């Protein structure tokens, strides 16, 4: 008889009773994943629904936290001794790697959620031994508790580390709220092995939206592409990867050189001495991983990246030492004790210029990584590095600004920053908005403006699609985009195909005429912005469409948006926000390897929509005739422009049979089951609401005979949510 007890539920002998059998996705791997729409449930959050992190952070004595971190950094612990007696370099790497997962392609990743605490990030090869950094910070977190999140603490500790070693940082903004389970919406790559690189195709074409070169790396391989020690080839990887993380060439050089001014690499021996990562380690390790069997397993015996050595002669002081060393020597390829490719000076005089991190009796030569030499040898990076070497103040300012951008890029506009150390300067990458300098319109003005809009000659379709185009650029991932600023009238958005530039121009000219007429009629300081008027136009159109369906209802509207200028808008930085697909407008720019319905769910997640909200918005946008190209696909109604539940009623009609119009199966014809008469055409995004069992369940709610009023109410609620996603001025007030 087995000594293992049987599970009281399944009756099976199993040491892991919580395990389950095959999941639905095991049987049907192509099943649409709606779970990304319902992440981070309050049920997983121990703080409770009434917890207000921003209020807690505002009550935090940030100076006291800084003092405690300063004290911690030079208080070396026997269980993980500090290199050079200072934990600063370790904390810089921790903060850098927390923020460095950000990518511009979809705005996901970054430091804002504190996700470095969870798998997979806590166990990525590139994050080896950062578990120790977080454990060292635990007494600080424990002391201040709910007043500072892990997400904020990781970044603030990095700032403190820089400051404690003599560097003046640009500032710090708090406000990052912790998540309590890993996010399921971030695609890290298709590889099934650490350091795999299936993400490349053709001649080193990197898959979107990925930025890192290999699975489990934050940026690039420091030994060179796939370990090939070619500095010029490494420069190409660096340029693409850092650009996909929102950094230009100068910012890239400043970040690499600034970061490598501090600390050292760890490769005291072969990787065979290193145990499992935290997620794979024994329960007795209590969250720690990478246990090392070489010598003491720590201090001078530490193995992390496999590379070994320091870049500068004083690794715990801010200076120009990185460039001094880089340009002072010629470099020869060598191998670390772990067998990793790195570079050492050809000049014998370099030996003994670098102190040992733990043994005062030892001295070493400096080393450089293949990626460091790229900063010297690349024809673009080289002159930038030379300029920084010759102008240390310029370098310091560039690094301060680039570090601030790195650690705050995913936080959104300055309105989201908290604390006394937020810089006053508006930075172009923050998508700045002008301050409001006028009195807001009131309810009477709103009613008057609605009347002018709906009698202006613009259709429900035109008004709805324009308002949606303006607001739906919002990405919850990095809080960019949205209707505030009315950037839809500026480059590059005004020229995006999905926004129907010719129609957009007509709508904007009409709304600007109404704006001018209204503003010029005011005797006081009252004004309406075009940003507000675009949204108000959409709201007025939805009200009219509801009225046409027999429902008198007011669509909520809150004025206060301002109008951004072109000079406040970085055209290059906004390019990644252009929709490759927008299922809500039945738009697909081209055919992709990912299905249209998957792209719809992805966009819904970025808009913070639940499955019911996504469903009701699709149904409403179709009957409001808001397709991007004015196509009839999915417009399952005989009365377009009227807010009815016809989309669901007709989609679920068993009197209709559907067939693809081509082998691509992206457009379908719906014909009468008896007569064969053509009734409708639709896309995958339309038909998925009848095909997918979960979405069909949602659609059936709105397709019932008693669902018309619920449909209108729910559509307006979801519409209003999207229109206000970027209204941080409201949320923070």
From Swiss-Prot:
<dbReference type="InterPro" id="IPR000763">
    <property type="entry name" value="Catalase_peroxidase"/>
</dbReference>
<dbReference type="GO" id="GO:0020037">
    <property type="term" value="F:heme binding"/>
</dbReference>
<dbReference type="GO" id="GO:0070301">
    <property type="term" value="P:cellular response to hydrogen peroxide"/>
</dbReference>
<dbReference type="InterPro" id="IPR002016">
    <property type="entry name" value="Haem_peroxidase"/>
</dbReference>
<keyword id="KW-0349">Heme</keyword>
<dbReference type="GO" id="GO:0042744">
    <property type="term" value="P:hydrogen peroxide catabolic process"/>
</dbReference>
<feature type="cross-link" description="Tryptophyl-tyrosyl-methioninium (Trp-Tyr) (with M-245)">
    <location>
        <begin position="96"/>
        <end position="219"/>
    </location>
</feature>
<dbReference type="Pfam" id="PF00141">
    <property type="entry name" value="peroxidase"/>
</dbReference>
<keyword id="KW-0560">Oxidoreductase</keyword>
<feature type="active site" description="Proton acceptor">
    <location>
        <position position="97"/>
    </location>
</feature>
<feature type="site" description="Transition state stabilizer">
    <location>
        <position position="93"/>
    </location>
</feature>
<dbReference type="GO" id="GO:0046872">
    <property type="term" value="F:metal ion binding"/>
</dbReference>
<dbReference type="InterPro" id="IPR019794">
    <property type="entry name" value="Peroxidases_AS"/>
</dbReference>
<dbReference type="InterPro" id="IPR010255">
    <property type="entry name" value="Haem_peroxidase_sf"/>
</dbReference>
<dbReference type="InterPro" id="IPR019793">
    <property type="entry name" value="Peroxidases_heam-ligand_BS"/>
</dbReference>
<protein>
    <recommendedName>
        <fullName>Catalase-peroxidase</fullName>
        <ecNumber>1.11.1.21</ecNumber>
    </recommendedName>
</protein>
<comment type="similarity">
    <text>Belongs to the peroxidase family. Peroxidase/catalase subfamily.</text>
</comment>
<dbReference type="GO" id="GO:0005829">
    <property type="term" value="C:cytosol"/>
</dbReference>
<keyword id="KW-0408">Iron</keyword>
<feature type="binding site" description="axial binding residue">
    <location>
        <position position="260"/>
    </location>
    <ligand>
        <name>heme b</name>
    </ligand>
</feature>
<keyword id="KW-0376">Hydrogen peroxide</keyword>
<keyword id="KW-0575">Peroxidase</keyword>
<dbReference type="GO" id="GO:0004096">
    <property type="term" value="F:catalase activity"/>
</dbReference>
<comment type="subunit">
    <text>Homodimer or homotetramer.</text>
</comment>
<feature type="cross-link" description="Tryptophyl-tyrosyl-methioninium (Tyr-Met) (with W-96)">
    <location>
        <begin position="219"/>
        <end position="245"/>
    </location>
</feature>
<keyword id="KW-0479">Metal-binding</keyword>
<comment type="function">
    <text>Bifunctional enzyme with both catalase and broad-spectrum peroxidase activity.</text>
</comment>
């Amino acid at each position: 008889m087995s000594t293992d007890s049987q599970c009281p539920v399944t009756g099976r002998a199993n040491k892991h009773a919580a395990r389950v059998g095959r999941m639905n996705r095991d049987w049907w791997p192509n099943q649409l994943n709606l779970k990304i729409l319902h992440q981070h449930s309050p049920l997983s959050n121990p703080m409770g629904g009434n917890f207000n992190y921003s209020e807690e952070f505002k009550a935090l004595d940030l100076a006291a936290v800084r003092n405690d971190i300063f004290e911690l950094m030079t208080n070396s612990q026997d269980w993980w001794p500090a290199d050079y007696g200072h934990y600063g370099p370790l904390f810089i790497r921790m903060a850098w790697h927390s923020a460095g997962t950000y990518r511009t392609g979809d705005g996901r990743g970054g430091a804002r959620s504190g996700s470095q605490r969870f798998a997979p990030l806590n166990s990525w090869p590139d994050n080896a031994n950062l578990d120790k950094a977080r454990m060292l910070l635990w007494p600080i977190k424990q002391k201040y508790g709910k007043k500072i999140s892990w997400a904020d603490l990781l970044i603030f500790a990095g700032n403190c580390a820089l400051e404690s070693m003599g560097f003046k940082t640009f500032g710090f903004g708090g406000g990052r709220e912790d998540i309590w389970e890993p996010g399921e919406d971030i695609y890290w790559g298709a590889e099934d092995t650490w350091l795999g690189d299936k993400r490349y195709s053709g001649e080193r074409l990197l898959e979107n939206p990925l930025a890192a070169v290999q699975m489990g790396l934050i940026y690039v391989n420091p030994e060179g592409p796939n370990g090939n020690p070619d500095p010029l080839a490494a420069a190409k990887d660096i340029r693409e990867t850092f650009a996909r993380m929102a950094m230009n060439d100068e910012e890239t050089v400043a970040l690499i050189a600034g970061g490598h001014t501090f600390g050292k690499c760890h490769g005291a021996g072969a990787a065979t001495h290193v145990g499992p990562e935290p997620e794979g380690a024994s329960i007795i390790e209590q969250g720690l991983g990478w246990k090392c069997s070489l010598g003491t397993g720590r201090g001078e015996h530490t193995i992390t990246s496999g590379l070994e050595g320091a870049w500068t002669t004083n690794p715990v002081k801010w200076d120009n030492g990185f460039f001094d060393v880089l340009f002072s020597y010629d470099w020869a390829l060598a191998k670390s004790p772990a067998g990793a490719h790195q570079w050492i000076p050809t000049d014998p005089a370099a030996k003994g210029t670098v102190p040992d991190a733990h043994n005062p009796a030892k001295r070493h030569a400096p080393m450089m990584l293949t990626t460091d030499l790229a900063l010297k040898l690349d024809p673009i990076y080289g002159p930038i590095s030379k300029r920084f070497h010759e102008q240390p103040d310029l370098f310091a300012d560039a690094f301060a600004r680039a570090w601030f951008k790195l650690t705050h890029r995913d936080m959104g506009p300055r309105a989201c920053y908290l604390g006394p150390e937020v810089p006053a300067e508006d930075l172009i990458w923050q998508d700045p908005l002008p301050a409001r300098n006028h009195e807001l319109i009131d309810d009477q003005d709103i009613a008057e403006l609605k009347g002018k809009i709906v009698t202006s000659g613009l259709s429900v379709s035109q008004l709805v699609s324009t308002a949606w185009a303006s607001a739906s650029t919002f990405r919850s991932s990095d809080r960019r985009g949205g209707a505030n600023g009315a950037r839809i009238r500026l480059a590059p958005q005004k020229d995006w195909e999905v926004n129907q530039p010719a129609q957009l121009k007509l709508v904007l000219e009409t709304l600007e005429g109404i704006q001018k007429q209204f503003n010029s009629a005011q005797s006081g300081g009252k004004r309406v912005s075009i940003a507000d008027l675009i949204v108000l136009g959409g709201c007025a159109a939805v009200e009219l469409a509801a009225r046409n369906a027999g429902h008198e209802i007011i669509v909520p509207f809150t004025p206060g948006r301002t109008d951004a200028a072109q000079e406040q808008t970085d055209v290059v930085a906004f390019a990644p926000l252009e929709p490759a697909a927008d299922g809500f407008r039945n738009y697909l720019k081209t055919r992709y390897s990912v299905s249209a319905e998957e792209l719809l769910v992805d966009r819904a997640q970025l808009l913070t929509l639940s499955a019911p909200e996504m469903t009701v918005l699709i149904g409403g946008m179709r009957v409001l005739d808001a397709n991007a190209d004015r196509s009839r696909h999915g417009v399952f109604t005989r009365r377009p422009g009227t807010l009815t539940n016809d989309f669901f009623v007709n989609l679920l009609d068993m009197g209709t049979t559907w067939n693809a119009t081509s082998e691509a199966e992206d457009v379908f014809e719906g014909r009468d089951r008896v007569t064969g008469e053509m009734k409708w055409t639709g896309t995958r995004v339309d038909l998925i609401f009848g095909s997918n069992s979960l979405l069909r369940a949602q659609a059936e709610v709105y397709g019932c005979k008693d669902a018309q009023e619920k449909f209108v109410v729910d559509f307006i609620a979801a519409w209003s949510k999207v229109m206000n996603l970027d209204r941080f001025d409201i949320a923070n007030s």
